């Protein structure tokens, strides 16, 4: 986010020397990016969408699906970082949430499951009936008919 909106908080992995160059690249290709994506009632996002965060700012899922429009006026809501990650919020935004937040916070019920990353797991993905964190440096395939997630070897 700090490359798309230069006002966004500076965070780890920010390359200040190349910020302007990468920012221009993102802006020229902004139509190719999405905050969330849905396939067959599965919701994909970087870190997860929690009802606590959407209710706090009265954000609708429709708004999140329109990334360019969302950036036009609500981008600062993406800066919410939870206590779990050293921030000041109960739950993080869809770019900052931590999978551990899924234990105590509600997920939108209109989806079969959320597929997320952002929280590096040791060796195995974290998969429940409602959310799957697949950030283990491996590739997976989701069968939307059987709800099975399998590692691709």
Question: Model-predicted segments: where are they?
Answer:
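Generic detector of intrinsically disordered, low-complexity, polar/charged segments
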Residues: 45, 69-70, 83-84, 89, ...
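Polar low-complexity intrinsically disordered regions enriched in Ser/Thr and small residues
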Residues: 51, 75-76, 89-90, 95, ...
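Low-complexity, flexible helical/coil segments
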Residues: 76-86, 148-153
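Residue-level detector of solvent-exposed, low-hydrophobicity positions
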Residues: 56, 74-77, 82, 95, ...
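Active-site neighborhood of divalent metal-dependent phosphoester bond hydrolases
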Residues: 1-80
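Conserved beta-sheet core of the metallophosphoesterase superfamily
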Residues: 95-152
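Alpha-helix-centered segments that form part of catalytic cores
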Residues: 15-33, 82-112
């Amino acid at each position: 986010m700090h490359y798309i909106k230069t006002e966004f908080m500076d965070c780890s992995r920010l390359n200040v020397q190349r910020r302007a160059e990468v920012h221009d690249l993102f802006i020229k290709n902004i139509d190719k990016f999405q905050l969330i994506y849905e396939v067959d009632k599965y919701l994909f996002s970087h870190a997860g969408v929690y009802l606590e965060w959407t209710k706090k700012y009265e954000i609708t899922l429709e708004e999140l699906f329109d990334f360019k429009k969302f950036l036009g006026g609500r981008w600062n809501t993406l800066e919410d970082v939870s206590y779990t990650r050293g921030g000041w919020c109960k739950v993080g935004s869809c770019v900052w949430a931590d999978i551990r937040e899924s234990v105590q916070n509600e997920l939108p019920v209109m989806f079969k499951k959320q597929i997320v990353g952002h929280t590096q797991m040791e060796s195995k993905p974290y998969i429940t009936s409602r959310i799957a964190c697949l950030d283990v440096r491996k590739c997976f395939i989701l069968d939307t008919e059987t709800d099975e997630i399998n590692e691709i070897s």
